[in-house]
A protein has these predicted regions:
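Active-site cofactor/cluster-binding pocket
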Residues: 1-191
Length: 191
């Protein structure tokens, strides 16, 4: 199997690191060689958080270069656009449509770009966009955006049984919120 490259991007505090941990756990248990690498930047101050998850028969490096990502899983819309150059031509963006204003926008020095999904699609990018925040809140907590996105991502890996996704979820989230996260995952699957 060729190496599959997944970038998980978001803003600090959104749960992207838990999502990458769950994904890595899932893929190791599915029998793949897996490499995970995290880049935090100014994540504690609302800055970008990027995680690379690579899996296949044999993976030699945890880093994804520009033009190599099969998937960009984005917790925030501008982050999807910011990292788009890492997507390969046949790749896909799976993104939350939530918009979190970066500091230059908050300070009035810039405007949040409009119509980002349409702009990416106009460039030929395959974009699977949904309001993950609304679905997470429907499941019971805004903090479950990560599991909504993981549920949506599972749609693109039909060879990995849903039971394996759920087992990885249970192994990586606190017991008191497992049921809520299962609901969020299921809502993400439905899209």
């Amino acid at each position: 199997m060729e190496t599959v490259n997944i970038m998980i991007v978001g803003v600090g505090g959104q749960g992207s690191l838990l999502a990458s941990k769950m994904l890595g756990h899932l893929l190791v248990n599915a029998g793949y060689d897996v490499k995970v690498s995290e880049v935090h930047g100014m994540s504690q101050r609302g800055g970008s958080v990027v995680t690379y998850v690579r899996f296949g028969d044999k993976v030699y490096s945890p880093i994804i270069d520009k033009g190599e990502a099969d998937f960009i899983v984005s917790f925030e819309l501008l982050e999807a656009a910011r990292w788009i150059e890492y997507l390969k031509p046949s790749g896909r963006v799976v993104t939350n449509t939530q918009q979190m204003e970066p500091m230059p926008v908050i300070a009035g020095l810039a405007e949040y770009p409009e119509n980002l999904v349409e702009k990416m699609r106009a460039k030929g990018v395959q974009v699977d966009a949904m309001d993950c925040l609304a679905l997470a809140e429907e499941a019971g907590s805004a903090k479950a955006v990560n599991m909504v996105l993981m549920g949506r991502l599972s749609h693109y890996f039909p060879n990995i049984p849903l039971e394996a996704w759920h087992a990885s979820l249970e192994a990586n989230v606190p017991a008191k919120v497992v049921e809520l996260n299962h609901k969020a995952f299921a809502l993400g699957q439905k899209g």
